[in-house]
Amino acid sequence: MVTGTRPLKSHRRARRGRAAGRLTTTTLATLFMIAFGVYFLLPLVWLVFSATKTNTDLSSSYGLWFAPTFALGANAHDVFTRDDSLFAQWFVNTVLYAGTVAIVSTFLAMLIGYALAKYRFRGREVIFAAILGSIMVPGTALVLPLFLLLSKAHLVNTYWGVILPQLVNPFGVYLMRVYSSQAVPDDLLAAARVDGAGELRAFWSIAARLLTPGFVTVFLFGFVGTWNNYFLPLVVLSDPKLYPLTLGLASWQTKIGLGGEMTYTVIITGALIALIPLVVAFLLLQRYWRSGLLLGSMTG
């Protein structure tokens, strides 16, 4: 009897040990994610609280809580009225840059990625390898040749000087090829061709609908990347009326260093306002980009 119960007790101890190990791993992973969440959210929380303060309260009050004077409305009014409402012009410019680049580059990425995934032709892998290689090239290495090309084309200090260099997104092409290979079944396309549908009709009627989550994911990457782009406008633009928000807020910050009338609360509030469209876009489109990233991670 004693001999028969020993294996059972050992089995129970082993199960408890495995359960304790899983619990420890889950707890550590949860704590790790909480720590990273706090790390990433802390600057945003500070930004929200700081945008509600006066310039005096900004340095005299606790950073992660409200000050006695709630000045968010006054700060926002100051942001939009300073320098003849130049911030509003920067906001419109940024929407124009980010919207145009995101829509066009994502559409091109969808077409190219779909073609690389669903068609067999000579040089396909070479083209895809070149696209992957271009992802590895740092943007700073292309600044001088890009500036010279834009200068020759008389596109420096124009809207097109910011938009054109960003219309092709190699990373977006990569994502759309990976997504197309899994989201669009070959049998479905073959059935459409048997029914008499041409390649364009098969793409628009079938593939484009199935690629919507991937399209939204790449769109968000392009939109956020262009919205936050600072270096390219810095090189291409010199007219403040053409600045995006990133370059405009940086120019205001420079005025503080030069002893101007600019205050930190204006820049902080402007940065908070600049974040709102990004947050809204992610919240409205989260249903699509979550599924797009999920399938991309499974196929990658």
Regions found by a protein language model. Name each.
Residues 1-20:
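Short, Lys/Arg-rich, polar N-terminal cytosolic tail immediately upstream
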Residues 23:
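DHp/HisKA histidine-phosphotransfer helix
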Residues 26-300:
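A structural signal for multi-pass alpha-helical bundles of membrane permease subunits
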